[in-house]
Amino acid sequence: MVTIRDQYVFESKVTDAYAERRVVTVLHELAHMWFGDYVTMTWWNDLWLNESFAEFTSTLATAEATEWKDAWATFSSGEKSWALNQDQLSTTHPIVAPINDLNDTYVNFDGITYAKGASVLKQLVYYVGREKFFTGINNYLNNHAYSNATLADLLATLEEARQPLPGSLLHEHELLGDGLVGAVFHRLLQLLEDVDGHIHV
């Protein structure tokens, strides 16, 4: 069952932006049927496996199955900006945040867990490949149905789905440690020019 706030039960005409927000919100809550209910994170440090996936899939579904085909543009101007702003604060944290007790969870229902995590998932789609990404997600859901999962479980199913590509998602620093889900602040690229005028990243 999904409940909805009164603010989304419109009694008069609303702006297209507000109607789109309702669609994304309803789809976000429906996504929790899979990401949160069907498969639940093992511990709160992986809260993003619920919230980032719900944010990502709700935006994807809005863009591909509703009249709001520019939902990713809306995401970039709203949610992604929210994440970038929060990532500049002294209170920022990694997407996979250290959670020592339940009191630590309260600060993680924020732009990092929702929007930055969803942005990382969108990057993973391009990194793994769309078809292989969704094959991996399907396997992740089926392998952990009605049970718990971790980031390592997710990466293992994505790694299996992307074979025979070289390398390992589990060990690439772009994803763990100082990378996308383990780092704070947004990533910066440094460009250096050598004596021959070649640019290096």
Where do the PLM segments sit?
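Residues marking helix boundaries in flexible regions
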Residues: V96, N100, G182-F185, H200
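Sequence-pattern detector for short linear motifs
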Residues: S119, L165, L180-G182, Q190, ...
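Hydrophobic, low-acid, alpha-helix-prone terminal segments
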Residues: H173-L176, L180, V184-V195
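Hydrophobic alpha-helical and helix-loop surface patches within well-folded domains
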Residues: M1-L170, G177
